[in-house]
């Protein structure tokens, strides 16, 4: 109950966070100064127009009196022109402050916020991520889309709001000064303008939150698909993923339409300003007739009140951005403010002066928060003496890895305590505690950076010599040195550029470099080949000397030298003792496990006594090292020249095509039609209302009261009609464009993901195309396009319509004045266009930084356990700062440019008003136009100029939108080098499984200097089982990659059933091929859903799923879970143990009933008992199928029809298990078998 109460109180606190001040919590002293100056600029910007209108007051009254003569009239003109020019100069300074200060502080605060957010995410305990299965996509969204929303709010939307709000206030100040009676009467009408905006803001918060939840669900699906793209491709699950993605997006479309309707009602309600003008015109006429008020002053006051109302409407339209910023900020602040139960930032806690390393679990009870109904430990008691090696063995899912997690304080026990040197670990400083431990996990986690940087995660201040020594100790130095870039070689996202054994050795080096007091080895050698395992095991044995070591292993041969071996069963220690002591217990569980593994090894010997001397072992090791080095050195020159052909040029300039975007919107043409028509009619409203307002002024100077009453009645009815018309067309406009934007966004997201899932695997190997960066583009680009189509396009149509109508009316009324006024408008347009072009050129690096930040954040969350174990949070933050260094410098230039362009634009508007004012006065003085025509045209073009200026404020959004359009079509137009849906491809009704590699040359496109195969040939008979063995990194897994056609060879061909694999329809071919990878990739969903990914049809019976699970020895543990097959696997299967994940992956492969079965270390993560049963199941499944098995453990491949030993990128020898052993000590396979026997 306590935790629930805490959660509730936490929610209550969160409600108070969404205040305007909380958004500025990342501002420092400089930012507050910038915001203060920016506030002055924004408020001053709002005062400019009311001040200009105030200047008009004298002119209008002079124009309305018959006593005005040419001399006094021109003096008045000159006086006002000079005043306007002063205002123009002042407006440049004010608007420069507004543009520079807000842009600068927005980018500064956003960068600081991203850092604090990522720091807060990395601060959370592991249990937080267990409960948030979409945590990776959450972080990608917040670090990219949410931070961008807040940055836009600070840089542009907030100053716009302040400017409009101050314009509203300034207008009423001027009005009150000039005519307080009319102002007081008009003031209560503010309520009519406030209520719709406030209601819209409240509704939008709720809708925005729901839209984010829908997007987040869809983003999680996309992130899973992209990060596990090999699994998706192998099982032909592209359409399933796209279908789930599309379904998740449907809810957001409906919510988006509700949002558009709400916006239309709100903006339409602002048409009440026309009704207000109607009333004030009527009341003003009464003041003129009954109180002798001056007509010009009445008109100026009404204009100010109306302008103030329009400005208020503009500011209320910005409530959308306030709401979006608050919603985005709540999501970010929720994480920033969350203090985890196990806080790595907490500096309090005891630090032991001299740590011995004695570990004790005292009556520990534990369950995972994500599975509270499943008890892992009920009363665990375990004592590990200092400096001793203790091995934990037991069935998969028995809780072995949980011991390590508890010791590192990933979690805290529900009851009991864990002691180190007699001190409870919850009393020790968390970071110091973890710094005393070195962890090598079952599934090695590497970061998308260089090998050196990955090893330095273990010890930040280590020297290069220490890095090399650690690599040597883990047997990694040799293969690292063979790379052209050596230790600077990039490992790729999730270490994809390295083989499993290479990744594991780098991970071991990372653990060794910190010289820990306690060494934690969770299946540390499971991915290594026999020769590497022997050397690494010796290294680990040496590293264990003098320090407490906890070893988890399924292969009992690796733990026989442990001081103490503990057998865990059902969360209890059932047996304890040394290897020899436990073997004395004939009926003991450990004895049965050893017997089971010995049976496998004895069978592998087939009654042949294998005896290998240490010299032969070392000789073999040297031969393999030499052969690898030799093959690389001798073949690189002949192949490198061809690799570039396989690397597509994705650096083509992005060419946005708005026409193509509209073609994509073709299905919504009806909504587009009435949306555009409505927007055009909204545009007509502006010049028509301005024309009417200009005409009203002449009414106030009429001498006949009857005429004043009659004409006032006409204009009042006209304004009321405009109010009703505005309400209706705004609803139609915003709903129509919302419909267009939402469905276009959904279509873009679907098509982008669909297209991305056709790209060759190598595209995903490139650093810029990490899952984080791609998901960021999916979220950000589509959102920007929606904003451009839904909001900006409607404003563009509106503006064009207003300009056309204004020009027509102006030319009809007074063509001379109209031509001058029209000719100066392009200056404003050019100024804003310059802003767009220059800001676009400077925004590219900032956009790249966003992608880099998203990529880094996604990788950090995906590997949170490794980061937590090594206390590497600060290292990740340093990497984040590094990727933002360049964009931070560019932001300074962007800020200066924003200030200069905005200041110039605003001052130009005032200067053009001065010019129009002067020239119009000259025409009146010369008798070429009447004053009424001047008022009409002047107001039409002043208000139209404001419309153009408002449209100009969207140039940044348009620039960003066009960039996003270019980015979208860059993805949609990209031609993959391996087309999975080639319509001309051969669709086989059945595959026999005859596989041929003929003279194949291959090197990975991202590492063209490292040759894997040269002139490689192999024949794999249909229906037969073939095992591939060899040293780690020798190309075993590459064979599977080529068969799955993840890659194409540089030369030669890969054939299936005698047909070049490139001639097949790839997706149909993959239906007949099943893959079980070395590192099983599961998706967030239930166990049932994960197994069903192996189905080739949409309808799969429950009995088929259960049979597949039974074949993989998964059924029993699944049914033992409280939710059975409906148990949620968590993000990437985090809720399951390694063995459980592997068995589900095997069940998924079995369900496919393939013709070709590919097993890449399929049983490496299983304990002995499970491995035996699963191995039997696999052997049954392999019967009658072409099976290719990659294994380091030779006992698992002894029954294969053919065993192939790789070396030098060629086949060293091949044959059956017995025939290869008959070659004796001269045979490579014989030597490998001997090495494994010496390890047993």
UniProtKB/Swiss-Prot annotation:
Domain spans labelled ABC transmembrane type-1:
35-324, 672-960
Task: Please give the Gene3D superfamilies that the UniProt record associates with this protein.
Answer: ABC transporter type 1, transmembrane domain (1.20.1560.10), P-loop containing nucleotide triphosphate hydrolases (3.40.50.300)
In this protein, the residues bearing a glycan are 70, 542, 609, 642, 769, 1015
Q: How does it sit in the membrane?
A: Multi-pass membrane protein
Q: Which residues bind ATP 2?
A: 1030-1037
List residues of the ABC transporter domain: 359-595, 995-1233
Is Mitochondrion tagged as a keyword?
no
A Gene Ontology MF term for this entry?
ABC-type transporter activity
Q: Which UniProt keywords apply?
A: ATP-binding, Glycoprotein, Membrane, Nucleotide-binding, Repeat, Transmembrane, Transmembrane helix, Transport
Q: Which Pfam families match?
A: ABC_membrane, ABC_tran
Q: Where does ATP 1 bind?
A: 394-401
Please state where this protein is localized.
Membrane
Keyword Transport in annotation? yes
Q: What is its main location?
A: membrane
Q: Name one GO cellular component term.
A: plasmodesma
The portions of this protein that span the membrane are 36-56, 81-101, 158-180, 184-206, 264-284, 296-316, 681-701, 714-734, 793-815, 817-839, 896-919, 923-943
What family does the database annotate?
Belongs to the ABC transporter superfamily. ABCB family. Multidrug resistance exporter (TC 3.A.1.201) subfamily.
- What is this protein identified as? ABC transporter B family member 17
Organism expressing this protein natively: Arabidopsis thaliana
């Amino acid at each position: 109950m306590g935790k629930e109460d805490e959660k509730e109180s936490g929610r209550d606190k969160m409600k108070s966070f969404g205040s305007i001040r909380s958004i500025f919590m990342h501002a420092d002293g400089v930012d507050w100064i910038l915001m203060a100056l920016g506030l002055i600029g924004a408020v001053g910007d709002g005062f400019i127009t009311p001040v200009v209108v105030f200047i008009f007051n004298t002119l209008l009254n002079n124009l309305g009196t018959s006593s005005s003569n040419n001399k006094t009239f021109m003096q008045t003109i000159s006086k006002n022109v000079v005043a306007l020019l002063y205002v123009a100069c002042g407006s440049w300074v004010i608007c420069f402050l507004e543009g520079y200060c807000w842009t600068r502080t927005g980018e500064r605060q956003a960068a600081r916020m991203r850092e604090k957010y990522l720091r807060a995410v990395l601060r959370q305990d592991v249990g937080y991520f267990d409960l948030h299965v979409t945590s990776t996509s959450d972080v990608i969204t917040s670090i990219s889309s949410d931070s961008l929303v807040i940055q836009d709010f600070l840089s542009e939307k907030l100053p716009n709001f302040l400017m409009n709000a101050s314009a509203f206030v300034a207008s009423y100040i001027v009005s009150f000064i000039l005519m307080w009676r009319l102002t007081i009467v008009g003031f209560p009408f503010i309520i009519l303008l406030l209520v719709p905006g406030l209601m819209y803001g409240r509704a939008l918060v709720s809708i925005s939150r729901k839209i984010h939840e829908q997007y987040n669900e869809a983003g999680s699906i996309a992130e899973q698909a992209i990060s596990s793209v090999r699994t998706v491709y192998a099982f032909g699950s592209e359409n399933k993923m796209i279908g789930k993605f599309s379904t998740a997006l449907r809810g957001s479309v409906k919510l988006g339409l509700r949002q558009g309707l709400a916006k239309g009602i709100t903006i339409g309600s602002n048409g009440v300003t026309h009704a207000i003008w109607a009333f004030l015109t009527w009341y003003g006429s009464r003041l003129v007739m009954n109180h002798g008020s001056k007509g010009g002053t009445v008109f100026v006051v009404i204009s100010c009140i109306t302008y103030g109302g329009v400005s208020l409407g503009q500011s209320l339209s910005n409530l959308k951005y306030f709401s979006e910023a608050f919603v985005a900020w709540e999501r970010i602040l929720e994480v920033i403010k969350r203090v985890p139960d196990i806080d790595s930032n907490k500096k309090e806690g005891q630090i032991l002066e001299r740590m011995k390393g004695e570990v004790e679990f005292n009556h520990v009870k534990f369950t995972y928060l994500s599975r509270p109904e499943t008890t892992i430990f009920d009363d665990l008691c375990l004592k590990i003496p200092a400096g001793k090696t203790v091995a934990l063995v037991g069935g998969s899912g028995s809780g072995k890895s949980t011991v390590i997690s508890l010791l590192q304080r990933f979690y805290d026990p529900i009851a009991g305590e864990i002691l180190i040197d007699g001190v409870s670990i919850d009393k020790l400083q968390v970071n110091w505690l973890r710094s005393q431990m070195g962890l090598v996990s079952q599934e090695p986690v590497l970061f998308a950076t260089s090998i050196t940087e990955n090893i330095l995660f273990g010890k930040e201040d280590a020297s290069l010599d220490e890095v090399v020594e650690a690599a040597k100790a883990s047997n990694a130095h040799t293969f690292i040195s063979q790379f052209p870039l050596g230790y600077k070689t990039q490992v790729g996202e999730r270490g994809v550029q390295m083989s499993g054994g290479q990744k594991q050795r780098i991970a071991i080096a990372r653990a060794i470099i910190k010289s820990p007091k306690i060494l934690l080895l969770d299946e540390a050698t499971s991915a290594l080949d026999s020769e590497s395992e022997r050397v690494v095991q010796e290294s680990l044995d040496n590293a264990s000397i003098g320090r407490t070591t906890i070893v988890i292993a399924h292969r009992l041969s690796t733990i026989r030298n442990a001081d103490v071996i503990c057998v865990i069963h059902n969360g209890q220690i059932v047996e304890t003792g040394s290897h020899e002591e436990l073997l004395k217990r004939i009926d003991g569980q450990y004895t049965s496990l050893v017997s089971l593994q010995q049976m496998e090894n004895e069978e592998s010997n087939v009654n042949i006594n294998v005896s290998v001397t240490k010299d032969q072992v070392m000789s073999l090791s040297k031969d393999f090292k030499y052969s690898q080095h030799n093959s690389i050195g001798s073949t690189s020159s002949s192949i490198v020249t061809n690799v570039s052909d396989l690397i597509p040029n994705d650096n083509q300039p992005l060419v946005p095509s708005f026409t193509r975007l509209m073609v994509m919107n073709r299905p919504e043409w009806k909504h587009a039609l009435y949306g555009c028509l409505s927007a055009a009619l909204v545009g007509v409203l502006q010049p028509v209302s301005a024309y009417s307002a200009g005409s009203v002024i002449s009414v106030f100077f009429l001498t006949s009261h009857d005429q004043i009453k009659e004409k006032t009645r006409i204009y009042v009815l006209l304004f009321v009609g405009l109010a009703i018309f505005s309400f209706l067309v705004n609803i139609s406009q915003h709903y129509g464009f919302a419909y267009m934007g939402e469905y276009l966004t959904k279509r873009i997201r679907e098509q982008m993901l669909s297209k991305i899932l056709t790209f060759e695997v190598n595209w995903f190997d490139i650093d810029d195309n990490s899952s984080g960066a791609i998901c960021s583009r999916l979220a950000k680009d589509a959102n920007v396009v929606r904003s451009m189509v839904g909001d900006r396009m409607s404003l563009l149509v509106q503006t064009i319509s207003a300009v056309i109508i204004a020009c027509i009316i102006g030319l009809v009324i007074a063509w001379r004045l109209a031509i001058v006024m029209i000719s100066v408008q392009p200056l404003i347009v050019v100024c804003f266009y310059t802003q767009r072009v220059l800001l676009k050129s400077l925004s590219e690096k900032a956009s790249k930084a966003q992608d880099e930040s998203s990529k880094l954040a996604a990788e950090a969350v995906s590997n949170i356990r490794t980061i937590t174990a090594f206390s590497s949070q600060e290292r990740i933050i340093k990497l984040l700062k590094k990727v933002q260094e360049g964009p931070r410098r560019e932001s300074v230039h962007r800020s200066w440019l924003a200030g200069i362009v905005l200041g110039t634009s605003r001052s130009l508007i005032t200067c053009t008003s001065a010019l129009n004012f002067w020239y119009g006065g000259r025409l009146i003085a010369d008798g070429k136009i009447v004053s009424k025509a001047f008022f009409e045209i002047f107001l039409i073009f002043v208000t139209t100029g404001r419309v153009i200026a408002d449209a100009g404020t969207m140039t940044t959004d348009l620039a960003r939108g066009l960039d996003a359009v270019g980015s979208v079509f860059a993805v949609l137009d990209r031609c993959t080098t391996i087309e999975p849906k080639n319509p001309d491809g051969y669709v086989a009704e059945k595959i026999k499984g005859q596989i041929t590699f003929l003279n194949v040359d291959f090197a990975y496109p991202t590492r063209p200097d490292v040759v894997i195969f040269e002139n490689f040939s192999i024949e794999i008979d249909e229906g037969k089982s073939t095992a591939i063995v060899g040293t780690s990194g020798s190309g075993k897994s590459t064979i599977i990659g080529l068969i799955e056609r993840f890659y194409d060879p540089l030369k030669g061909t890969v054939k299936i059933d005698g047909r070049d694999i490139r001639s097949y329809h790839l997706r149909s071919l993959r239906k007949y091929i099943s893959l079980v990878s070395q590192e099983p990739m599961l998706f967030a969903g239930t166990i049932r859903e994960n197994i069903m990914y192996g189905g080739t049809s949409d309808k799969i019976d429950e009995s088929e799923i259960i049979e597949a699970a039974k074949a993989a020895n998964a059924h029993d543990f699944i049914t033992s879970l409280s939710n059975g097959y409906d148990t949620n696997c968590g993000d990437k299967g985090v809720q399951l143990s390694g063995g459980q994940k592997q068995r589900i992956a095997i069940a998924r492969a079995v369900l496919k009933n393939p013709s070709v079965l590919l097993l890449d270390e399929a049983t490496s993560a299983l304990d002995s008992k499970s491995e035996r049963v699963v191995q039997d199941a696999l052997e049954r499944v392999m019967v009658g199928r072409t099976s290719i098995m990659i294994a380091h453990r030779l006992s698992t491949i002894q029954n294969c029809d053919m065993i192939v030993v790789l070396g030098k990128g060629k086949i060293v020898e091949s044959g059956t298990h017995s025939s290869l052993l008959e070659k004796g000590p001269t045979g490579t396979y014989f030597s490998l078998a001997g090495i494994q026997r010496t390890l047993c």
